[in-house]
Amino acid sequence: MRALSDWFIVDFDDKRIQIRIVEPGTPSKTEILWKDIIRVCYKTGSFLESDEIFIFVKQRPESYLIPTEASGTTDLWGEIIERNLFDAKEALNAVLAEDHTVTCWPPPK
């Protein structure tokens, strides 16, 4: 079985995030513009589960899900924090939270 990082790939530049699925039979590519992001959530997994990043944009009610085991996700998480789309202190708390804890930025009103 191939590792998730072999077929789920995340790249970004100054304008967009690109999510590519290169699994045979189900290739796809999605782009998310930085300027369209309205909320980011981080969900901790358990010992055998990947943590997950959820990105919400203006144009759709559902989020984009990016498992932290995907290739490029560590750099993406750093860029999300650098762009102030997630508070740095809260990001540390989110990553260290108990299993299955969801932390969002900005926090719910």
Describe the residue ranges of each PLM region.
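Extreme N-terminal tail/first-helix region
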Residues: 1-7
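Phosphoinositide-binding peripheral membrane targeting modules
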Residues: 2, 13-44
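Short, exposed beta-strand/loop patches in secreted or surface proteins that constitute
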Residues: 7-13, 56-57
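Acidic, Ser/Thr- and proline-rich intrinsically disordered linker/docking segments
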Residues: 28, 38-109
